[in-house]
Structures are given as structure tokens and as C-alpha cells.
Amino acid sequence: FIASEVMFFVAWFWAYFNASLFPTEQIGAIWPPADIHLMDPWHIPLINTLILLLSGTTLTWAHHALQEGHRKEVIQGLILTIALGLIFTGFQVYEYMHADFEFSGHIYGATFYMATGFHGFHVIIGTLFIIVCLGRMLSGHFKPDHHFGFEACAWYWHFVDVVWLFLFAAIYVWGYY
């Protein structure tokens, strides 16, 4: 499953770098297009990056606690990770509401919203996945030696984290400078 997700993001990065490294006359032969006011990467995008990195840490903490049989710490780690996922999503919505460009009209907006929107969708799905894990943990379904669903969730969440690091570097930082 994750391999198919990787292929989507590889295709997106291909389109993004093709448009940015070889801008055509249709977009004014510059990247980003002249009428685009980019977001400062060192404000909300950086905050979101730190939130996702912290969420990966809290989920890893919960996973280690599960392996050690520390139920209370697992629950705390999952609750923190859920909260961080929701905060990330809230900041992403705020960023969309205050962006100076739209999805339509140019390749920059289309690639920006497609990539960050698809990633945001994955964060929402991952947060729901973690909520399910929390419910299963509270119901006693996970044991130190039997927790594949938890591990699958952790792999998915870390994949989403890694994708964000590439998006942050490509869209926000590299695109800004």
C-alpha cells in the first residue's frame, strides 16, 4: 500500500520539478510565476514541520511503551499524537484560507494544493488510524507481542512524516528562494 502512495508522490515531484526547473513561456518562463506571493517557509510551514516531527516521536514513544507493556504511556502517546495530527490539520486549513493564490489558474497553485492537499488527506486518514489504535488499546486488543495493527499505523504515520519533509523542502523552502 505504501509503495503505491510513494508512486503518487514521485509523480507529483516529477511534475513539480519539471515545471520549476524548466518553466515554459505559458507561465512567463520563470518559477514561481510572477503573480504568485509565496508563503514564508519559516512561519506556519516550519511550525507544521515541527508538529509532525514531534508527532512521529510521540507515536514512537507509544510503540516502545506498548512493547514494554506500559499501557498508560501507550495511551498518553496516542492521545498526544492524535492532538498533534489535529493541530497540523488546523494549521493547514488556516494556511489555505490565507494563501494568496488558488488551485486554478496556474501550475504553481495546482501543484501546491495537489501535493499539500493530498498529504493533508493522508494526515487525516493517519489520525483516524491512530484513533482506531487508541480504541483498540483501550479495549485491550494490543499486547507487547501482538500488535501488528499498531505497527502498520506507525509505518503509515512515519511515511506521512517523511513525505512532509520532502514537501517542506521542495515547496516551501526551495520554492521560496
What are the residue ranges of the model-derived segments?
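...captures the hydrophobic TM-helix bundle architecture rather than a specific catalytic motif
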Residues: 1-177
